[in-house]
């Protein structure tokens, strides 16, 4: 089972986006977002919600709670 930060990185890289691009969407800095993707800082729920809406995936998918629920 993948960690949520690994899934976030894959989602970002699959769309050829930079950490700075996602940080701007979240209203944070690239440095802070980098710490989320490395698993150093925990991702706030408000950011999880924003990213799920942006990527079109469920929170269950990002959190690896169920393999069959990529779509909301």
Language-model features: where?
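Short alpha-helical DNA-recognition segment
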Residues: 16-35
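Short, basic-rich loop-to-helix N-cap that marks the start of a DNA-contacting helix
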Residues: 40-50, 69-71
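Residues that mark the N-terminal boundary/hinge immediately upstream of a DNA-recognition element
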Residues: 7, 18, 44-47, 58
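Short, charged recognition helix plus adjacent turn
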Residues: 11-14, 53, 63-72
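DNA major-groove recognition helix of helix-turn-helix/homeodomain DNA-binding modules
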Residues: 27, 47-61
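Residue-level detection of the helix-turn-helix DNA-binding "recognition helix"
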Residues: 13, 27, 38-40, 67
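A short, Lys/Arg-rich alpha-helix, primarily the initiator
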Residues: 1-14
């Amino acid at each position: 089972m993948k960690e949520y930060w690994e899934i976030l990185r894959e989602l970002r890289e699959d769309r050829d986006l930079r950490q700075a691009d996602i940080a701007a969407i979240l209203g944070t800095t690239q440095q802070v977002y980098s710490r989320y993707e490395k698993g150093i800082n925990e991702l706030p729920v408000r950011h999880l919600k924003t990213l799920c809406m942006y990527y079109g995936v469920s929170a269950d998918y990002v959190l690896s709670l169920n393999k069959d629920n990529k779509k909301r």
